[in-house]
Curated annotation (Swiss-Prot):
The gene is ADAM5. Interacts with TEX101. It comes from the Eukaryota. Pfam families: ADAM_CR. InterPro entries: ADAM_Cys-rich, Disintegrin_dom, Disintegrin_dom_sf, EGF-like_dom. This is Putative disintegrin and metalloproteinase domain-containing protein 5. SUPFAM superfamilies: Blood coagulation inhibitor (disintegrin) (SSF57552). Keywords: EGF-like domain. This is a non catalytic metalloprotease-like protein. PANTHER family: ADAM A DISINTEGRIN AND METALLOPROTEASE DOMAIN (PTHR11905), DISINTEGRIN AND METALLOPROTEINASE DOMAIN-CONTAINING PROTEIN 5 (PTHR11905:SF28). Residues 351-385 form the EGF-like domain. It comes from Homo sapiens (Human). Residues 111-199 form the Disintegrin domain. Highly expressed in testis.
C-alpha cells in the first residue's frame, strides 16, 4: 500500500523583514515514523500539486532552540531550500525561499496564529497535555519534550488500497422470502444499503405480506412470544378477546372495532395442558369453539406521558406497543394489512407505476424497496433478461461476471 502525506499550512506571510540572529546549533534530527515508500504532496500558491518521495527528505528536518533566549523553539527543514519557524517568547517568525528570485535568497516574516494556545505560554503543561498528538523518543528528556511541543497538521491520503473482491457477501439476508443478501461491489469500502422485498408483496404462499424485510405471519409471532409450536388464533378468538377493552384485549387506548380486531393484541392458540410460564408475562385463557385462545400482557416499563389521552388500558399510543401486539404488516383481510392497530388497504403501500413485477421484471423477479427488480437466478437486472450466472438487482452489489480484484487508484 502506498501512502501519501498532504501537509497543509494554516498561516500566510504577513510582511517581510531582514532578520539576523545568532543561533547555537542545538539541533535534533527527527526520525520518521512513516514508511520510506511514502510520498510528500504539497501545493503551491496556484494550487498546483507537487509530489516528492519521502525517502530523500527523511534526514533534512531539524528542531532546536535559540541560544540565550529561554523558552524559544526552532524548527527547520533544508529538504528544499531553507524553511521553518522560529518561535520566541511572544512572537514567531517564519523563513522560506523566495521562489521568484534566483539565488539563495529567503524572506523572513512574522507568523500569526488563530489558536494562541499553540504558542509557548506560561503554562506549558496545557500545551503538552491538550495537544492532539504527543510524540517522543525514549532517548529524549521528558523536560525538553514538555518545554518544546511540536505541532503539524497532517492528512494521510490512501492512494492505493485493495478492497474485498466483488461478489463477496457483506450482509447476509435475515429471511428467505423477504430479505436479500448484499455483496461487495469491489469499488466501495462499505456495504450497500439493505435491500428487501417491497412492503406489501406476498409471502408464505400468499398467506402473509412482506414488511420491512420480514414475512409477517401470525404463527411466527406467536411462536416467538410463547413458543412450543403456538400458532395464530382464528378470527373468532380475536373477536372474543380484542373487544374486551382491557390490558389483554385492545387496540391501544380502548377496545378494537370489528374491522380492526386482527390488528390489536396478538391472540394465539395453546394446545398444551400446562400453563405458559415466562418471567413478567401475564396470560389469560379463553375457551372459544373448542379452541384455547390466549392473550398476554407485559407491565409498562415507563410511566405514561404527560397530557396523555384518556385510556382504559395501560397503552396510550402506537409507540407503546410491545411484542404482545400484532406487528405492522400483518395480514388482516384480503389485500389488507395492519398498521398502527388499524387495518388498511395494501395498495397504498405499493407504487405499481414505478415497479410492477409482472411487467417490469418479465415475471422472473420481484420489486424491492427501491422499486427495482430483484431477479431470479439466471436472469439479469434491471429487467430480468436471461443471462447465465446473473441474479439480484442493481442495488445489492452483485456483479456479472465477477472481477478478481479492484483497486481505488488516484485519478480514477
Amino acid at each position: 500500500m502506498q501512502t501519501s502525506i498532504l501537509i497543509k499550512s494554516s498561516c500566510r506571510p504577513q510582511f517581510q523583514r531582514r532578520f539576523h540572529h545568532r543561533m547555537q546549533k542545538q539541533i535534533q534530527n527527527i526520525i520518521s515514523i512513516l514508511s520510506s515508500a511514502s510520498v510528500i504532496n504539497s501545493y503551491d500558491e496556484n494550487d498546483i500539486r507537487h509530489s516528492k518521495p519521502l525517502l530523500v527528505q527523511m534526514d533534512c528536518n531539524y528542531n532546536g532552540y535559540v541560544a540565550g533566549i529561554p523558552n524559544s523553539l526552532v524548527t527547520l527543514s533544508v529538504c528544499s531550500g531553507l524553511r521553518g519557524t522560529m518561535q520566541l517568547k511572544n512572537i514567531s517568525y517564519g523563513i522560506e525561499p523566495m521562489e521568484a528570485v534566483s539565488g539563495f535568497i529567503h524572506k523572513i516574516y512574522e507568523e500569526k496564529y488563530a489558536d494562541t494556545n499553540i504558542l509557548l505560554e506560561e503554562n506549558d503543561t496545557y500545551t503538552w497535555f491538550n495537544s492532539e498528538y504527543q510524540v517522543r523518543k525514549s532517548s529524549e528528556k521528558t523536560d525538553f519534550i514538555k518545554l518544546f511541543p511540536r505541532y503539524i497538521e497532517m492528512h494521510i491520503v490512501v492512494d492505493k488500497n485493495l478492497f474485498k473482491p466483488a461478489n463477496m457477501i457483506c450482509r447476509k439476508s435475515v429471511g428467505k422470502e423477504c430479505d436479500f443478501t448484499e455483496y461487495c461491489n469491489g469499488d466501495l469500502p462499505y456495504c450497500l444499503p439493505d435491500t428487501y422485498v417491497r412492503d406489501g408483496e406476498y409471502c408464505d404462499s400468499g398467506g402473509a405480506f412482506c414488511f420491512q424485510g420480514k414475512c409477517r405471519t401470525f404463527d411466527k409471532q406467536c411462536d416467538d412470544l410463547i413458543g412450543r409450536g403456538s400458532r395464530g388464533a382464528p378470527v373468532f378468538c380475536y373477536d372474543e378477546i380484542n373487544t374486551r377493552g382491557d390490558n389483554f384485549g385492545n387496540c391501544g387506548t380502548a377496545h378494537c372495532l370489528f374491522q380492526h380486531i386482527l390488528c390489536g393484541k396478538l391472540v394465539c392458540t395453546w394446545e398444551h395442558r400446562d400453563l405458559i410460564s415466562r418471567p413478567n408475562l401475564s396470560v389469560i385463557y379463553a375457551h372459544v369453539r373448542d379452541q384455547t385462545c390466549v392473550s398476554t400482557y407485559l407491565p409498562r416499563r415507563t410511566p405514561p406521558p404527560v397530557n396523555s389521552p384518556i385510556s382504559i388500558t395501560s397503552y396510550y399510543s402506537a409507540e407503546d406497543r410491545d411484542e404482545t401486539f400484532v406487528q405492522d404488516g400483518s395480514m388482516c383481510g384480503p389485500d389488507m394489512y395492519c398498521f398502527e392497530m388499524h387495518c388498511k388497504h395494501v395498495r397504498f403501500l405499493m407504487n405499481l407505476k414505478l415497479c410492477d413485477a409482472s411487467n417490469h421484471c418479465d415475471r422472473h423477479g420481484v420489486c424491492n424497496n427501491f422499486n427495482h427488480c430483484h431477479c431470479e437466478k439466471g436472469y439479469n437486472p434491471p429487467y430480468c433478461q436471461p443471462k447465465q450466472g446473473a441474479f439480484g438487482s442493481i442495488d445489492d452489489g452483485h456483479l456479472v461476471p465477477p472481477t478478481e480484484r479492484s483497486y481505488m487508484e488516484e485519478g480514477r
